[in-house]
Amino acid sequence: MGKEKFSRSKPHVNVGTIGHVDHGKTTLTAAITSVLAAKFGGTAKAYDQIDAAPEEKARGITINTAHVEYETANRHYAHVDCPGHADYVKNMITGAAQMDGAILVVSAADGPMPQTREHILLARQVGVPYIIVFLNKCDMVDDAELLELVEMEVRELLDKYEFPGDTTPIIHGSAKLAMEGDKGPMGEQAIMKLADALDSYIPLPERAIDGAFLMPVEDVFSISGRGTVVTGRVERGIIKVGEEIEIVGIHDTQKTTCTGVEMFRKLLDQGQAGDNVGILLRGTKREDVQRGQVLCKPGSIKPHTHFTGEIYVLSKDEGGRHTPFFNNYRPQFYFRTTDVTGAIELPEGKEMVMPGDNVSIIVKLINPIAMEEGLRFAIREGGKTVGAGVVAKIIA
């Protein structure tokens, strides 16, 4: 079956929905696709098409994020809808890592809830640079003062996690009304306002297209008759069909060749920074590649286990630990797409670290990870995020 080529006529931006469960993330995602498809062309996606995606079996393997695409007058957007439940945090992290900006959905009827806070914190942690707020279900709130109060609460929460609360666009509307074809200010007009905010508030990302090719592995599929396909978002550089690449991290570094690139099921000659792609690898077995590794230009990045980091430990109120930790504490370090256990060495004279502290640490991981200074990570314990950090200096 011949695949159509993917058009690059408009600049491409990655966004996604975040926020508390049942505040309307998926309904809003569906509303955006239907309103913008009617106006600028594209495909409307129904709620259940998007909602099914978190548990979707694609070629027999579960993918945990729904990807949709839509266009505004000026741009092409790829949009991920992250599942909202707390136990999906790992997927939220991988989803949020693919965003040039996030749409935070807050129910006007409920106001900010625990996952609202958690998702803003995660956005801060995984380096989502911009947040736009969609205050949903405004049709259910008659009191204008109450709406103002909720908006104020959201702005304060954004400030707390170092997003510019005062200048963040907050759009009032109802995703449900928009889905039902309501042409009023709460319906389609609110979606168009949101589209304008996406275009004007989220700057075109400075793509690291000139860097050495790097793509964190998110998923691996075996496709009969074609070989092994690795999916992920190209972090930087360009990958062309026929180029040699390395698989780095966890195991010994392996060399392979890219024999195909596809995006939204369309074939490309190349994948470039910012693209969500599938890369076909020659002669690589399904079991030779796993989440947590990276594909990269040969020699451009090395695997490491030993580094110093600057970390912030979440307070109890932020959902972090209730007790301090001590030297040789062994949590999981979440790099890009996976958890790796590591031991923490505290600075001399520092006996313990309290929730809410920030501290310089030395870390030794049990498996090597493709690493550079400036790489961000989360610290997790039993599936719960307890800290955030950045690689300050590589030791070995």
UniProtKB/Swiss-Prot annotation:
A Pfam family this chain is assigned to: GTP_EFTU
Positions that bind GTP: 19-26, 81-85, 136-139
A GO MF label: GTP binding
CDD domains found in the cross-reference section: EF_Tu (cd01884), EFTU_II (cd03697), EFTU_III (cd03707)
Signal peptide per UniProt: none
Disulfide bond residue pairs: none
Main location per the UniProt record: cytoplasm
Region annotation G2: where it falls in the sequence: 60-64
Residue numbers spanned by region G5: 174-176
Record-listed Mg(2+) binding positions: T26
UniProtKB keywords: Cytoplasm, Elongation factor, GTP-binding, Hydrolase, Magnesium, Metal-binding, Nucleotide-binding, Protein biosynthesis
Gene3D superfamilies named in the record: P-loop containing nucleotide triphosphate hydrolases (3.40.50.300), Translation factors (2.40.30.10)
EC number, as in UniProt: 3.6.5.3
Locations listed in the record: Cytoplasm
InterPro entries: EF-Tu_GTP-bd, EF-Tu_GTPase, EFTu-like_2, EFTU_2, G_TR_CS, P-loop_NTPase, Small_GTP-bd, T_Tr_GTP-bd_dom
Family named by the database record: Belongs to the TRAFAC class translation factor GTPase superfamily. Classic translation factor GTPase family. EF-Tu/EF-1A subfamily.
Protein name (database record): Elongation factor Tu 1
Chain's gene name: tuf1
